[in-house]
């Protein structure tokens, strides 16, 4: 018999994935050009030519044993350092390779950090509407996802409700900015309010509350809209990122976590 937890997971399996599979089925019948797929975030923009050239060069120039061999659990040091320096240049941060952990996409990163911090029965807060897989990610490790109800006029956080939901059992808050599915971007003022509430609650309750910034859509901000980098506003912040959207590479599953030195137990 399979585990009861897995039965429940399969029973509530991803609607997004089900829609994707149904889209594939319909495309075979009516032609892909006649089916509009709004399920998975599969970009319809090709990956940059530079990505394809880099892949070809690596395959041609790297020794096969090295290319296909095991690596450090955290990823290649030079790749992690390059990411750290890119972040420092863009966001005026002070990271180095030790703050970067390569992951299998943003989903792999979120599962990694949640497994690291959650004890069974602890709660993770997020703001509705949210990416549906969050509930599965949290439940994978015995946690409970608690959603702040949406302000359907603006889709901005309802801070009064958020503050009331934080308790001794709260382990983390997931913020998806820009948000999936609404596309809303939380401004610097909004992030500052969020950080202040979390800091005050940490002191009041005598616990560590982690802020998990889920950022696969960071580059999809237009018309001069700026997306705040959350590590600059709250010390206990971990960032999860993926190149799936920014470089149109969802199938490659390339992501990373940023774990600043200031995060509790960062080592």
Please describe what each predicted stretch is.
Residues 6-11, 149, 182, 244-245:
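Glycine-rich "substrate-gating" loop/helix at the edge of Rossmann-like oxidoreductase active sites
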Residues 215:
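Walker B catalytic acidic pair
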Residues 44-48, 181-184, 219-220, 248-250:
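Short catalytic/ligand-binding loop motif for oxyanion handling, primarily in non-cytosolic enzymes
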């Amino acid at each position: 018999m399979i585990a009861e937890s897995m039965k429940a997971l399969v029973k509530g399996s991803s609607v997004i994935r089900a829609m994707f599979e149904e889209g594939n089925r319909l495309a075979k019948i009516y032609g892909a050009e006649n089916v509009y797929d709004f399920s998975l975030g599969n970009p319809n923009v090709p990956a940059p030519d530079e990505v394809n050239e880099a892949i070809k060069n690596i395959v041609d120039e790297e020794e096969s044993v090295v290319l296909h061999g095991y690596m450090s659990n955290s990823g290649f040091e030079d790749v992690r350092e390059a990411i750290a320096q890119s972040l420092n240049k863009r966001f005026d941060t002070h990271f180095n390779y030790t703050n970067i952990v390569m992951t299998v996409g943003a989903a792999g990163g979120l599962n990694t950090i949640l497994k690291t911090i959650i004890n069974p029965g602890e709660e993770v807060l997020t703001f509705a509407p949210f990416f549906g897989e969050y509930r599965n990610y949290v439940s994978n490790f015995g946690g409970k996802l608690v959603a702040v109800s949406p302000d359907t006029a603006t889709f901005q956080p309802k801070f009064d409700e958020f503050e009331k939901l934080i308790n001794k059992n709260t382990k983390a808050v997931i913020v998806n900015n820009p948000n999936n599915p609404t596309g809303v971007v939380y401004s610097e003022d909004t992030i500052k309010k969020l950080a202040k509430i979390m800091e005050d609650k940490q002191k009041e309750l005598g616990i560590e509350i982690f802020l998990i910034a889920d950022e696969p859509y960071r580059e999809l901000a237009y018309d001069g809209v700026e997306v705040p980098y959350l590590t600059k506003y709250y010390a206990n912040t971990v960032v999860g990122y993926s190149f799936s959207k920014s470089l149109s590479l969802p199938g490659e599953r390339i992501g990373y976590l940023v774990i600043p030195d200031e995060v509790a137990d960062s080592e």
